[in-house]
Amino acid sequence: VTLLFRSNAYMRIEGSLIAKGTLEAPICFRGNRMDYMFPNQPYDRISGQWQGIIIGRRCIGVDMDFCDIHSGSYGLFFEGTDASETSPLMTIRNSIIHNMSGHGIEAHNSHLHIGNSQITNAGGNCISIYGGKHEFIHCTIGQFYPFSALSGPALYLANSYSGTFCPLYQADFINCIITGYSDDDIIGESIGDDDETHPFRYRFSHCLLNTPEVVDPLFINNVWESKEHKVMHENNFTGFIPPSLIYGFQLDSLSSAIGI
């Protein structure tokens, strides 16, 4: 199943969204242009071809499996509900969110469970989290956006938005790859230093991380990318053909992510 969107079109969800494809036949959300900008670059590989998917405040649940969302202005925008730990669960599995001119995922006071998925290449941040409760397991979060040198990090975490406090109750990243072209692809900003009154809770376990190494008990058995590694950043992956805007995120056999 392929859903085609015109340049200013978007999907807004205020009830629930259930989209379940298969490995052989994923559900695809993309722009409607079938022509080429250049002989080796179809418009489908150019970001900003449509808007994206908005998960509204009244949404009661998202269940997406084997979905491919690509080449929009944003991927998934979660408006969120109240700043509590009881927000409706939004589940995404075995899916790709790729090549957005803005953020790949932007979540406000939401409850996300994302597993075995790829969130890559964004003109903004691949993932922007403002408060809420989140778990990412077996995910590749890669920032190799080709259309701007000013793109954001792969991952941005905060417990405030435009001066408004948004408690970050949980942000767990387990067996994930978080990398990109820059020297630091994980940025966190917290207001307040009291965990009870201003929660800013995160955990990284058994991940490959492109960020300066820190001593922190909430970073557990991770591999830190450094210049000592023969294979790092984009070389972790096979299938990158930038002139044709093709980005395959299958792991290279020499990647430091193998075995973590």
Name each model feature, range by range.
Residues 1-260:
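Beta-strand/loop edge motif enriched in small/polar residues
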